[in-house]
From Swiss-Prot:
The lineage of its organism: Bacteria, Pseudomonadati, Pseudomonadota, Gammaproteobacteria, Lysobacterales. This is Molybdate-binding protein ModA. NCBIfam families: modA (TIGR01256), PRK10677.1 (NF007958). It comes from the Bacteria. Molybdate binds at residues 36, 63, 149, 176, 194. Coiled coil: none annotated. Keywords: Metal-binding, Molybdenum, Signal, Transport.
Amino acid sequence: MRMIGFWQRALCVLMLTLPVLASAQTAPVTVFAAASLKESMDEAATAYEKATGTPVRVSYAASSALARQIEQGAPADVFFSADLEWMDYLQQHGLVLPAQRHNLLGNTLVLVAPASSKLRVDPRAPGAIAKALGENGRLAVGQTASVPAGKYAAAALRKLGQWDSVSNRLAESESVRAALMLVSRGEAPLGIVYGSDARADAKVRVVATFPDDSHDAIVYPVAALKNSNNPATAAFVSWLGSKPAKAIFARRGFSLKD
C-alpha cells in the first residue's frame, strides 16, 4: 500500500510539472516573408536560433498573398514585405505594431536571361525588350496588379516607354521567384526580378539594371504583428537590424536601410 501511495504522489507531481516544462520550451517565432527573401531569411533563422535558442519558422510567398492571409487571421508573429504598400495596408487595418516596424532593406530591379543566352538589351532603347523577346517569347514578371516585383516592373516599363510593346506578352507569375524560375528553366527568354534574385540563381544572368528613377524605391519593411502573443517576437524583429543579420542580407545582394 505504501508503494501504491508513493507512485500516486509521484504521478501527481509529474502532472503538475508537465505544464511548467511545456511552457518553458521556447515557442518558435513565425515569420511571413516575401519570396525574394528566402535564402537570406533561411540563413538568418538558423543564425538566430543558434545564437538565442529560439527557433524561427518562415513561410514564403508574394507579399500580397501573405498580407491577405494575415488579414484573414493566419497565425504569424512577423511580416517581412517586399514593398511598403502591403505593410501600410496591414497597418491601416490595425494589424501591425507601428513601434516595431522598420524599413530594413533595399534592392535593385534587373532584366535577366538564361545564363546561356547571348541577348544584350538596353531597356532605354525604344522597343528593345520586345525585339529581344523574338516572335513568340514572353517576358516573365510577377503579377503586375499585386506582386511588388510585378508592380515595380510595370512602372519601369511604362517609364522607359516599353510597356505598349510588351504588355500583351507578359508571363505574369504568383511571385517574383516563380517569374525567376521561368527564366531559369528557359521557358521565358527574359524576366524582370530583383537583383538579389539574380544573385541567388546561377542559371540566369543580368542583362540590364533598370534605372532607380524608373520605379519607386524598392523598400523591404519588417514589423511585429499586433496579434502575436509570442514574447520572443520583439527581440527577433530587433535582431534583424543587428550587424550579424545585416551581414547576411548584404551578402545576399540587398542594400541596407536602417
